Amino acid sequence: DQYKSIGTNEFLYDSLRYYGEPSEKDVQNAQFILHLPPNPNDKVGERVDAQGIIKILAAMVEQENYTWEMKLDETMVANALVSGTTVRINSNAKLYETDAHALAHHELGVHLATSLNGRMQPLQILSLGCPVSTTTQEGMAILSEFLSGNLTLQRLKTLALRVIAVKSLIEDKNFRTTFLILKETYNVSDDLAYTITARVYRGGGYTKDYLYLRGFSAILSAYEHEKDFNNLLAGKTSLEFLPLITRLIDKGLLIAPHFITPAFKNPVQSDAVNTFITHAIR
């Protein structure tokens, strides 16, 4: 429904209705991350272009036996986007190798995997998803980056900057003002400030981006405390429904997830500094 109102004042209203807005706690978490010094242990590797990104994604697809259709798209703001089993990649994307591997674990390891698992379910909603599942889905995607060893402090800062940008949008700041807040207050490059601002202002005001950091915190806690955590991969669902999903799987009414996120199966030892930081987000 929201896409019907793109470019109108209704789009921001629908965005707030679906995704809400950052709480004071969300903003405090973002500020905490943004005031941290660089982590000298973060390794980023060489820069790769869209073809290099495709090579990294294709390797994971082959390894995990995913079904996908890959399309290059020069009109995208994001670096990649999964819709069903179609993976769109920004033809202008240039990422460090670590970020490209993080992208693979994010988009394929969670978004594509839950799409494929959801299509196997008798309940169609688990394939389609809905706005209420966004926090969980994006939280799991960031967790996948973290457990694969590819979540850098700079990536966390980018997620934190999205919170600040959404807050600025809601405070009725215009595009230019939000861009300058990111650039001048947080010393962000022109390219990154523009990309973050464009993501938030697209369509007329898209508040979804603040949910990545909130979702990651909630999902990290669930990963560490919920024994049936992987059942969240059964489709496009939300953390609050995990007990119900588990009961339905146990009764044979839903199918246990076939595709398990690689980083959930084989997590790597994370950098001690970033591990401390991620657990400090509350």
What are these regions (language model features)?
Residues 98, 113-137:
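Post-HEXXH active-site segment of zinc metalloproteases
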Residues 51, 102, 135-138, 172, ...:
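Conserved structured core elements
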Residues 81-86, 111-117, 189-193:
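Active-site-adjacent bridging/hinge elements
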Residues 1-95:
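Contiguous, non-catalytic segments that form substrate-binding/exosite surfaces or channel walls
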Residues 109, 113, 117-118, 145-149, ...:
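Hydrophobic/aromatic-lined pockets within catalytic cores
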Residues 99-113:
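Short alpha-helix carrying the canonical HExxH Zn2+-binding catalytic motif
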Residues 155-282:
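Conserved alpha-helical "signature site"
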Residues 127-167, 215:
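Post-HExxH zinc-binding segment in Zn-dependent metallohydrolases
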